[in-house]
C-alpha cells in the first residue's frame, strides 16, 4: 500500500487527508503476513517476524490511520492450511481461530509487541508524522527503495522533520 502513496503525493485527493484512509496489512478475511511468509515463501519464523516489523514500520509512518488485526502486534501467525488435502480452504477460512495469547510468554512475542508499542508512541508523539505535511521524496524502483518524509509546518519556525527510507528488497 505504501508504494501507492507515490501516485497521490502531489495530487489533491482524499488519500492526502490523513484522517480519511484506513491502512492495514491484514484483515479478517486474509491470512497473516507471518503465516504467508512461513507457509508459502519459506521464511523461518524469525525472518517472518523481522519482515513483519519492517512492514509495520512502514504502516505506522505512512499517511492514514493504521489498523491492526487480532494479535498482529505480537506476531500471531493466523491463517489456514489444506489439512485434508482437497484444495478447499473455505471451511478453515470460516472457522473460529482464537488468538493464542501464550505467544506473549515468549521472547519473540514480547519483542514484536515492544516494536509495535514504539511505533505507536513514535506516531503519537512526533508531530511531523501525526500532523505534518507529507513529502514523497525519492523512488528507486529498480532497487525497491522509497524515501518519504514529513515536516510539521503548522507554526512558523517549527522545523520538526522525519525522513523514512524503506528498502523492500531482501
Tell where the protein language model's regions lie, with residue ranges.
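Acyl/amide activation-and-transfer machinery of modular secondary-metabolite enzymes
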Residues: 90-100
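Histidine-centered active-site microenvironments of extracellular/periplasmic hydrolases
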Residues: 80-91
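Conserved alpha/beta catalytic core and glycan-binding cleft of carbohydrate-active enzymes
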Residues: 1-81, 124-130, 134-135, 139-170
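Aromatic- and carboxylate-lined catalytic core of secreted/periplasmic carbohydrate-active enzymes
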Residues: 99-140
Amino acid at each position: 500500500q505504501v508504494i501507492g502513496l507515490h501516485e497521490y503525493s502531489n495530487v489533491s485527493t482524499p488519500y492526502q487527508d490523513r484522517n480519511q484512509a484506513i491502512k492495514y496489512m491484514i484483515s479478517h478475511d486474509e491470512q497473516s503476513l507471518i503465516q504467508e511468509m512461513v507457509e508459502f515463501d519459506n521464511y523461518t519464523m524469525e525472518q517472518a517476524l523481522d519482515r513483519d516489523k519492517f512492514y509495520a514500520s512502514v504502516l505506522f509512518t505512512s499517511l492514514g490511520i493504521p489498523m491492526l488485526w487480532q494479535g498482529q502486534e505480537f506476531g500471531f501467525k493466523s491463517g489456514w492450511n489444506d489439512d485434508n488435502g482437497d484444495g478447499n480452504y473455505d471451511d478453515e477460512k470460516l472457522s473460529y481461530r482464537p488468538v493464542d495469547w501464550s505467544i506473549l510468554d515468549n521472547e519473540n512475542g514480547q519483542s514484536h509487541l515492544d516494536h509495535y508499542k514504539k511505533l505507536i508512541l513514535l506516531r503519537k508523539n512526533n508531530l511531523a508524522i501525526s500532523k505534518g505535511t507529507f513529502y514523497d521524496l525519492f523512488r528507486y524502483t529498480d532497487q525497491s527503495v522509497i524515501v518519504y518524509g514529513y515536516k510539521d509546518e503548522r507554526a512558523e519556525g517549527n522545523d520538526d522533520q522525519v525522513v523514512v527510507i524503506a528498502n523492500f528488497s531482501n
